């Protein structure tokens, strides 16, 4: 590459800011400006450079203003608020030469804004992302809630460890068909599926998996992070094939079930423990805990027998209930 071309390419990709670097490239021609958000804040000085070998006859416009903002190959602006963000375009002779989109990431009292996603407050405050795994294969699902329904974009990236990252691939975030109601308000639910590239289900985990969701709403940028071991987000599927078998000369029945198809194998190593409960219309019997896949219970008319599972050796989340009717 010719030295002059190298200089042009370098300047076309870089925005110059104040000595504290508060501007970075999210993707090609999209830049994040980090701002301290308080009254009379000075903002950030941003220098935009037109991606062209031309030197003369260049003018600048913004989608936030109908006026010509300046002329020349560079444009210096002061970014203080959302009215200063948006798309900037350099022109010559009526032709658009290049565009740069500025998004704002605001910080108030030293804390980055979290306006886009709903705080689910479980298992602790500031829990914006929730993730679960059905087994130890390295596949997991994450989801989040938002009240916003338009002008919204998400991207997800993940890795195991930061010093020596191992690949975790995440798909595109998808909007669930059903809304989620929380505190008498409806939210949109987004989910994403992720898979660790190389994993040994039986190996002890030493490096945390980190998931980062980048959210853009109009001209606002935010990011949200969750870190975990797979073992800490395990939630098996419910037991399958529940069956009731009457016992001779007894008011009891034998309820039996099988491991869910999605659970890790061999089951002799990846073992589950189970909780069994008879649930009537107005009463729930005492829960029974066991490692085997059958139990004897007293099954009343109009009652259900329900069973749930969790990892036997590590205190994972309990699965949802599987149930079978006594009648």
From Swiss-Prot:
Residues 1-22 form the signal peptide. GO terms for molecular function: cytokine activity; cytokine receptor activity. Residues 23-106 form the Ig-like C2-type domain. The keyword Glycoprotein applies. InterPro entries: FN3_dom, FN3_sf, Hematopoietin_rcpt_L_F3_CS, Ig-like_dom, Ig-like_dom_sf, Ig-like_fold, Ig_sub2, IL-12. Residues 238-327 form the Fibronectin type-III domain. Glycans are attached at residue 223. Pfam families: IL12p40_C. GO terms for cellular component: extracellular space; membrane. The keyword Glycoprotein applies. Keywords: Cytokine, Disulfide bond, Glycoprotein, Immunoglobulin domain, Signal. Disulfide bonds join 50-90. Belongs to the IL-12B family. Heterodimer with IL12A; disulfide-linked. The heterodimer is known as interleukin IL-12. Heterodimer with IL23A; disulfide-linked. The heterodimer is known as interleukin IL-23. Also secreted as a monomer. Interacts with NBR1; this interaction promotes IL-12 secretion. Cytokine that can act as a growth factor for activated T and NK cells, enhance the lytic activity of NK/lymphokine-activated killer cells, and stimulate the production of IFN-gamma by resting PBMC. Associates with IL23A to form the IL-23 interleukin, a heterodimeric cytokine which functions in innate and adaptive immunity. IL-23 may constitute with IL-17 an acute response to infection in peripheral tissues. IL-23 binds to a heterodimeric receptor complex composed of IL12RB1 and IL23R, activates the Jak-Stat signaling cascade, stimulates memory rather than naive T-cells and promotes production of pro-inflammatory cytokines. IL-23 induces autoimmune inflammation and thus may be responsible for autoimmune inflammatory diseases and may be important for tumorigenesis. This is Interleukin-12 subunit beta. It comes from Bubalus bubalis.
């Amino acid at each position: 590459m010719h030295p002059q071309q190298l200089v042009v390419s370098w300047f076309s990709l870089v925005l110059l800011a104040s000595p504290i670097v508060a501007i970075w490239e999210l993707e090609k021609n999209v830049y994040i400006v980090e701002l301290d958000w308080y009254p009379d804040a000075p903002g950030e000085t941003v220098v935009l450079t037109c991606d062209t070998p031309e030197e003369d006859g260049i003018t600048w416009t913004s989608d936030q203003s109908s006026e010509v903002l300046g002329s020349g190959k560079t444009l210096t602006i002061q970014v203080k608020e959302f009215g200063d963000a948006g798309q900037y375009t350099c022109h010559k002779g009526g032709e658009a030469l290049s565009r740069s989109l500025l998004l704002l990431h605001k910080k108030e009292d030293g804390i980055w804004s979290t306006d886009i996603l709903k705080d689910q407050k479980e298992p602790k405050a500031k829990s914006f992302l929730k993730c679960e795994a059905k087994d130890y294969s390295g596949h997991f699902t994450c989801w989040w809630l938002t009240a916003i329904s338009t002008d919204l974009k998400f991207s997800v990236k993940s890795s195991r460890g930061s010093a020596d990252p191992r690949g975790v691939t995440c798909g595109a975030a998808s909007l669930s068909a059903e809304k989620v109601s929380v505190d008498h308000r409806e939210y949109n639910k987004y989910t994403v599926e992720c898979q660790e590239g190389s994993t040994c289900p039986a190996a002890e985990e030493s490096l945390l998996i980190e998931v980062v969701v980048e959210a853009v709403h109009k001209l606002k940028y935010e990011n949200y992070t969750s870190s975990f071991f797979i073992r800490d987000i395990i939630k098996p599927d419910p037991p399958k094939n529940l069956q009731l078998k009457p016992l001779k000369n007894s008011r009891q029945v034998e309820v039996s079930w099988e491991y869910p198809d999605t659970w890790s194998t061999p089951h002799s190593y990846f073992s589950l423990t189970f909780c069994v409960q008879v649930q009537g219309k107005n009463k729930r019997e005492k829960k029974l805990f066991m490692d085997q896949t059958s139990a004897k219970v007293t099954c009343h008319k109009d009652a259900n027998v329900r069973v749930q599972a969790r990892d036997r050796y590590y205190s994972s989340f309990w699965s949802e209930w599987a149930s079978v009717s006594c009648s």
